[in-house]
Amino acid sequence: PAAGLSDPKIGNGCFGFPIDRIGSVSGLGCNRLVQNPPKPISGES
């Protein structure tokens, strides 16, 4: 299997590669959505 791609901790990020290699979120925001969905954005409208 793909090393890391199947890891729930990184959620294979947004591009299909382990985001953990560049710092988990690294400002990408892709992995952040997986563990922390943008609730304030939808509830603020």
Curated annotation (Swiss-Prot):
Coiled coil: none
Chief localisation class: secreted
Family membership noted in the UniProt record: Belongs to the natriuretic peptide family.
Superkingdom of source: Eukaryota
Location relative to the cell: Secreted
Organism name: Oxyuranus scutellatus scutellatus
Tissue: Expressed by the venom gland.
Entry keyword set: Disulfide bond, Hypotensive agent, Secreted, Toxin, Vasoactive, Vasodilator
Name assigned to this protein: Natriuretic peptide OsNP-d
CC terms in the record's Gene Ontology section: extracellular region
Residues excised as propeptide: 1-5
An individual GO BP term: regulation of blood pressure
Job of this protein: Snake venom natriuretic peptide that targets both NPR1 and NPR2. Exhibits hypotensive and vasodepressor activities.
Molecular function GO terms recorded: hormone activity; toxin activity
Lineage, broadest ranks: Eukaryota, Metazoa, Chordata, Craniata, Vertebrata
Cysteines joined through disulfide linkages: 14-30
